[in-house]
Regions:
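Tryptophan-centric aromatic hotspots in well-structured domains and transmembrane helices
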Residues: 12, 21-23, 40, 64-68, ...
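Short Ser/Thr-interspersed hydrophobic loop/turn segments at strand-loop and sheet-helix junctions
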Residues: 26-27, 42-48, 71-74, 94, ...
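Glycine-rich beta->alpha junctions and the first turn(s) of the following alpha-helix
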Residues: 50-150, 220
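Glycine-rich phosphate/cofactor-binding loops in nucleotide/flavin-utilizing enzymes
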Residues: 87-105, 192-247
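Cytochrome P450 C-terminal beta-domain/meander region
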Residues: 1-7, 164, 199-207
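C-terminal helix-coil-helix/basic helical segment that borders enzyme active sites and/or dimer interfaces
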Residues: 120, 124-133, 147-203
Length: 247
């Protein structure tokens, strides 16, 4: 017929509890290689065979989910690309996603400015913490990284505009943004000292803004492909190094 019956489970699906449709990558034939025989569907999430279970993060928020498919139905009309050609579609989606994540360099620059303001407001012995040489050194290092990420993003975006589609360079953008964001919010907690451990109404600075973003930043190094995957991609496809021995 014109429909596919799908069973399986997917963990860490972002915002599935809001979605009417989700990209689904499913195996539809054996294939000669592990990435062959895969098809990409645009799955209807509002059908009886789809169950979405929440995953509550350590910051108390609910962004991620487990999705269970029990005889879920997908139709030929919901296939993206061709049957058994889903790997190519998936790679294209990931490249677009990583380029989109890389665009967070602009918010990273704003967050750095907020971090500097925090360092000006936090005092130690009535002296702003930003006056300490080691703090200024760490802030300078973060500034260099954020500016480097921004310039690299502009370079990769320029190439993308020329060729008409995102490339593997998106892994660089994604890696830089994820790791720099985590480092920035870790520095914010460090600057606050023991007050950085306070939560919500007890937080002295920003009503837990820094604490919540610090906790969430760890997930940013996982979602959209872990930092380790990005490093392997950069090493193999940009630097031309040998493949990961574990593959």
């Amino acid at each position: 017929g014109d429909k596919w019956i799908i069973n399986g489970q997917k963990v860490w699906t972002s915002f599935a509890h809001f979605a009417d449709r989700c990209f689904l990558v499913a195996r539809t034939s054996k294939g000669e290689k592990k990435h062959h025989g895969i098809t990409c569907f645009l799955l209807d999430m509002n059908q009886p065979g789809v169950e979405v279970r929440p995953i509550i993060q350590m910051d108390g928020e609910h962004d991620f989910n487990e999705v269970y498919l029990n005889d879920a139905v997908a139709y030929d009309s919901e296939i993206i690309g061709a049957v058994d050609d889903g790997w190519r579609v998936t790679i294209a989606l990931l490249m677009h996603e990583r380029t989109g994540i890389g665009a967070q360099v602009f918010s990273l620059e704003q967050q750095f400015n907020e971090l500097v303001e925090l360092a000006q407001n936090v005092t130690e012995d009535n002296v702003p913490i930003i006056e300490k040489a080691d703090v200024r050194k760490r802030l300078l290092n973060l500034y260099i990284k954020s500016r480097g990420s921004l310039l690299n993003y502009y370079r990769n975006l320029t190439k993308q505009l020329k060729v008409g589609h995102p490339g593997v360079e998106g892994s660089m953008d994604k890696l830089f943004v994820s790791e720099n964001t985590k480092e920035l919010f870790a520095e914010a907690i460090s600057i606050q000292g023991h007050q950085g451990l306070l939560w919500k109404k007890d937080a002295i600075y920003g009503d837990s803004y820094w604490q919540k973003n610090y906790l969430y930043s760890f997930g940013q190094t996982i979602g959209g492909g872990t930092s380790e995957i990005q490093k392997n991609t950069i090493a193999e496809r940009i630097l031309g190094l040998p493949k990961d021995i574990g593959k």
